[in-house]
């Protein structure tokens, strides 16, 4: 399917011309207010847009499009309404693109024919018998008459086109003011266009049948069952124009007097030719939907005819009858009740369409949301199962990993109460980290540094539990490790330090605690049979809490080859109590 522009005089279609030079935009079928504005702008007679109806971008102003990038398609604003149409060409070519010139030629020829009979009769009455008797004068007189008639027809056709264009521009500006403007224009140009009225009425009555100039035929008032919306739409165009006129602010104007149209109809002997007066009398009644001024008669003394709209029901009953002349104010007053009825019919018509489309859209949205909700529930259930599995693994890891005996205690239980026996060593409790790194020296070793973590705790027994874990400062590789217990002799300051080291050495050190300082020395040392040499023979330790609240430890050592020499010094910062 090739997308084409729905405007009457537009030949743009998809694929024609350069790419993105012309874009196509669908009619807003779901927005009744905008759709009415689009239809009024397009002004196509007896036509209803579908979902395959489009308008090209040449019928919109530049400010009707949203600002986008150059490589993106044009996007209309939500309030955009088409306004660029060649309405003069449309009015003259309403019958079709190929018949425009033929219709204009037929109208001009009809006007010449209408005046040729009268001019011939007047010429025959004033012509001398001598000239009629001369056979050579007849061809010359015919040529003179034809030249005169053609000279008159040319300015009349131009004048008619100009008047139609002015009337159409007035209707485009405001539907309500267009009525008064057209009436004033018809009164001001009554005498100038009196001759053209009969010819144009005769042509429209012959070619149009029962369809008037506004494009509203009698089929609109007697639609079939499937064309109810089309019928109500045509009624709404009348309702909207009348309602718009009523809602405009009242401007003091001179009242328009009711004037009767003179019916000087003289029966003609010829059945094929129609005079100007007869053509006016037999022209179809003015449309009840759009008020258009009637052309005055040829007689210079005849007053200009007024606008003659009728209600829709009266127009249906009197199909070929003359319209009763009414003023603009009477039209507005008489149509006020009809406007409400037509508005209600139109709202029902469009609401029924919208309700169906809205129900379909809502149904699709509900199904889409249900699908999304279902997928979310599945994700939540999967997440819950994963959380349960992770919780089970975590519980299992907690049961398996028991770094300290205190971890066996329930976390909900309160910490155990300290035994009064170990109260003098309470300043050593807590978790300590070396800050700065510890330093190690010995005559047989290169100086080195290390990081160390110390845990000293109690479980309510008359002793303290300790562990010393050292690491390489750069690689964090585990190094020396030892753990054990610190006991106090009740009611004394005597302390015993029992330690087991990963080097295969077990030692017992004893000493005394004085305030916040503990000094101990090795009492007995045991080692495994395959321990490395040189063997340790004596160890001394000194713990103290300095003024900054940091714990210091100094270790001295004597081996089989070296006397007692300071080996380690480290300062700890308390991390947890």
From Swiss-Prot:
Annotated metabolic or biological route of this protein: Nitrogen metabolism
Record flagged with keyword DNA-binding: yes
Pfam families: THAP (PF05485), THAP4_heme-bd (PF08768)
Known cofactor(s): heme b
ZnF segments: THAP-type: 1-85
Subunit-level organization: Homodimer.
UniProt protein name: Peroxynitrite isomerase THAP4
């Amino acid at each position: 399917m090739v997308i084409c522009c729905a405007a009457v005089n537009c030949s743009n279609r998809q694929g024609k011309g350069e790419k993105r030079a012309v874009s196509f935009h669908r009619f807003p079928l779901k927005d009744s207010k905008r759709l009415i504005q689009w239809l009024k702008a397009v002004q196509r007679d007896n036509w209803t847009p579908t979902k395959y109806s489009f308008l090209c971008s040449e019928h919109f102003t530049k400010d009707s499009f949203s600002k986008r990038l150059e490589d993106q398609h044009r996007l209309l604003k939500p309030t955009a309404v088409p306004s660029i149409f060649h309405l003069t060409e449309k009015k003259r070519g309403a019958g079709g693109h190929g018949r425009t010139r033929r219709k204009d030629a037929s109208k001009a020829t009809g006007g010449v024919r209408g005046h040729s009979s009268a001019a011939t009769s007047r010429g025959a009455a004033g012509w001398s018998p001598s000239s009629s008797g001369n056979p050579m004068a007849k061809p010359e007189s015919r040529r003179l008459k034809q030249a005169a008639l053609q000279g008159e027809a040319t300015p009349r056709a131009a004048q008619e086109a100009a008047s139609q264009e002015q009337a159409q521009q007035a209707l485009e500006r405001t539907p309500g003011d267009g009525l008064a403007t057209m009436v004033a224009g018809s009164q001001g140009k009554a005498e100038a266009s009196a001759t053209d009225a009969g010819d144009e009425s005769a042509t429209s009555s012959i070619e149009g049948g029962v369809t008037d100039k506004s494009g509203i035929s009698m089929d609109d008032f007697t639609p079939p069952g499937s064309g109810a919306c089309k019928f109500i739409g045509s009624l709404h165009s009348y309702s909207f124009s009348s309602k718009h006129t009523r809602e405009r602010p009242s401007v003091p104007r001179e009242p328009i007097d009711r004037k009767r149209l003179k019916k000087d109809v003289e029966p003609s002997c010829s059945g094929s030719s129609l005079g100007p007066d007869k053509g006016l009398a037999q022209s179809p009644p003015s449309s009840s939907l759009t008020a258009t001024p009637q052309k005055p008669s040829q007689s210079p003394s005849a007053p200009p005819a007024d606008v003659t709209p009728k209600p829709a029901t009266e127009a249906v009953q009197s199909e070929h009858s003359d319209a009763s002349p009414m003023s603009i104010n009477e039209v507005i007053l008489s149509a006020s009740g009809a406007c409400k009825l037509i508005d209600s019919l139109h709202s029902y018509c469009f609401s029924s369409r919208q309700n169906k489309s809205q129900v379909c859209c809502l149904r699709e949205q509900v199904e889409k949301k249900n699908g999304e909700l279902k997928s979310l529930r599945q994700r939540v259930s999967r997440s819950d199962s994963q959380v349960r599995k992770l919780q089970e693994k975590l519980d299992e890891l907690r049961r398996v990993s028991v770094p300290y005996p205190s971890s066996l205690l329930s976390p909900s239980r309160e910490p155990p109460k300290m035994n009064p026996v170990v109260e003098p060593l309470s300043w050593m409790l807590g978790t300590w980290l070396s800050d700065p790194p510890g330093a190690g020296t010995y005559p047989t070793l290169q100086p080195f540094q290390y990081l160390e973590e110390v845990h000293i705790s109690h479980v309510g027994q008359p002793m303290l539990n300790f562990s010393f874990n050292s690491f390489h400062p750069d690689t964090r590789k585990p190094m020396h490790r030892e753990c054990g217990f610190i006991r106090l002799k009740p009611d004394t300051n005597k302390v015993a330090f029992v330690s087991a080291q990963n080097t295969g050495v077990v030692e017992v050190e004893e000493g005394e605690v004085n305030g916040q300082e503990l000094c101990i020395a090795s009492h007995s040392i045991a080692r495994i049979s395959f321990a490395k040499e040189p063997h340790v023979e004596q160890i001394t330790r000194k713990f103290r809490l300095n003024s900054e609240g940091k714990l210091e430890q100094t270790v001295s050592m004597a081996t089989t080859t070296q006397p007692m020499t300071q080996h380690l010094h480290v300062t700890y910062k308390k991390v947890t109590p």
